């Protein structure tokens, strides 16, 4: 009876982690879908940044898309909580202070994820709305002022987000989590860097500007976390058979 109870306890945690990872992956999918809505547009060589894009400025971009992006972000932001739970549960219980710091940074990330998502979506909305009405130069000036003004509040929000995933990355690298080090290949930090740098490398190699570059870079963070959630769920599944 004692052996069966011990076996049950050993299988319960992996089942919880799998559930959390699946819910987290769904949440990241919602967030990434919003990013794809913003980034899936025809690009030109002159396009720069998050909103200085000819397609937005022409008014051709559907104003309903940023609205849907925010709606998807609300659901995704809520489900991000399960990503935080899964990441925190990975870290060895011996490192209590580290777990607490990582968890608090993760909870802060959940709290501000929709704020950042909305900020980016509203820049696309304003650019699309203002471009045909007040001219491209005036629209860019107005949205740039909005971006720079809000950046004072937005920029510090990235610090706890970086810590939440950075701490987990370091603990995994040091062998202080439940996973093997080869799982670093699927870590959000690894994939985020990959998805951000690939379009830059392509442009450096003089590959013509294309929609996939915008989609890949804009959705890099959420797509990277989704990759981890799926990989972690598969890992847990294979180790509980």
Listing of model-derived features with the role each one plays in the protein:
Residues 10-240:
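Hydrophobic, aromatic-enriched alpha-helical segments typical of multi-pass transmembrane helices
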């Amino acid at each position: 009876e004692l052996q069966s109870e011990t076996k049950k306890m050993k299988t319960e945690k992996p089942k919880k982690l799998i559930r959390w990872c699946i819910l987290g992956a769904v949440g990241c999918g919602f967030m990434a879908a919003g990013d794809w809505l913003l980034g899936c547009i025809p690009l030109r060589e002159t396009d720069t940044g998050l909103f200085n894009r000819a397609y937005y400025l022409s008014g051709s971009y559907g104003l309903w898309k940023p609205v849907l992006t925010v709606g998807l972000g609300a659901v995704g932001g809520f489900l991000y909580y399960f990503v935080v739970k899964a990441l925190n549960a990975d870290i060895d219980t011996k490192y209590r202070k580290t777990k607490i710091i990582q968890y608090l940074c993760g909870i802060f990330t959940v709290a501000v994820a929709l704020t950042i998502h909305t900020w980016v979506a509203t820049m696309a909305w304003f650019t699309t709305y203002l471009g045909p009405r007040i001219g491209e130069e005036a629209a860019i000036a107005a949205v740039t002022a909005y971006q720079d003004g809000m950046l004072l509040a937005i920029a510090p929000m990235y610090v706890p987000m970086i810590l939440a995933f950075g701490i987990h990355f370091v603990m995994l690298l040091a062998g202080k989590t439940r996973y093997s080090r080869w799982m670093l290949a699927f870590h959000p930090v690894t994939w985020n860097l990959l998805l951000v740098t690939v379009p830059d490398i392509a442009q450096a190699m003089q590959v013509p500007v294309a929609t996939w570059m915008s989609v890949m870079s804009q959705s890099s963070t959420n797509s990277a976390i989704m990759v981890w959630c799926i990989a972690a769920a598969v890992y847990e599944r294979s180790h509980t058979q």
